[in-house]
Amino acid sequence: MIVFPAVDIKDGVCVRLSQGQADAVTVFSSDPVAQAKYWETQGARYLHVVDLDGAFSGMPKNFELIRDICSQLSIPVQLGGGIRDIETASKYLEAGVRRLIIGTMALEDEETFAELCAKFPGQIGVSLDAVNGQLKSRGWVEDAGITVFDIIPRIEAAGAAFIIYTDISRDGMQTGVNVMALSELCSKTKLPVIAAGGVATLEDVINLQPLVSKGLEGAVSGQAIYTGTLNFAEAMEWIENN
């Protein structure tokens, strides 16, 4: 299992939002590149980066910063936020991003999404962001009008390589992961699943471990590793030994 430390970028700094609210911001670092390098020193095997400005505006806003992160790390980077056309996706992959996380495009423009998956096989994942199973889009501010389970056959057919599932009600709230929902999701798809939202303690990491055999690839952690309720190095050590 991989624990992906999150570097969420807004206005050029590293922040965390509570439940995706743009006005519920906590700044954790003024230097996202240094923060990314720190997580690598702590044993990270993969970095999760989100361009929050891009997610809310629909266009890339922190390209140079993200390019710098990729160039200064030896571990791979996955990126989401504001990637809504093939040109933007290509630009990021050429800049060194290993794989991309697509949200709105996958829900609203399936033809372009399928074209993107065909152009970059194995590198395009889908972000499924939900409240009570109902998907949200456009930076979590709009109801997508479809459930998580309804969309799965469509994204599989389009050629998606993996799923990141966020329980919005738990994101940034440090309330623990929804193991039952994740288990059900893993059982409904052949794609690897990454959990996001609610990973708050080492106990949450331990609770997710049994799902690895069902298709869970790992979990994204943000708020918890910045506030210290989850010691990232300790979590990595536990995973290595179990």
UniProtKB/Swiss-Prot annotation:
Alphabetized InterPro entries for the sequence: Aldolase_TIM, His_biosynth, HisA_bact_arch, Isoase_HisA-like, Isoase_HisA-like_bact, RibuloseP-bd_barrel
Subcellular location: Cytoplasm
Gene3D superfamilies: Aldolase class I
Pathway recorded for this protein: Amino-acid biosynthesis; L-histidine biosynthesis; L-histidine from 5-phospho-alpha-D-ribose 1-diphosphate: step 4/9
Example of a GO MF term: 1-(5-phosphoribosyl)-5-[(5-phosphoribosylamino)methylideneamino]imidazole-4-carboxamide isomerase activity
Annotated Gene Ontology cellular component terms: cytoplasm
GO terms, biological process: L-histidine biosynthetic process; L-tryptophan biosynthetic process
Principal cellular location given in the protein's record: cytoplasm
Keyword Cytoplasm in record: yes
Keyword Amino-acid biosynthesis: yes
Pfam families: His_biosynth
Catalytic activity: 1-(5-phospho-beta-D-ribosyl)-5-[(5-phospho-beta-D-ribosylamino)methylideneamino]imidazole-4-carboxamide = 5-[(5-phospho-1-deoxy-D-ribulos-1-ylimino)methylamino]-1-(5-phospho-beta-D-ribosyl)imidazole-4-carboxamide
Keywords assigned by UniProt, alphabetized: Amino-acid biosynthesis, Cytoplasm, Histidine biosynthesis, Isomerase
Enzyme Commission (EC) number: 5.3.1.16
Family of the protein in this entry: Belongs to the HisA/HisF family.
Protein name: 1-(5-phosphoribosyl)-5-[(5-phosphoribosylamino)methylideneamino] imidazole-4-carboxamide isomerase
Protein's organism: Maridesulfovibrio salexigens (strain ATCC 14822 / DSM 2638 / NCIMB 8403 / VKM B-1763)
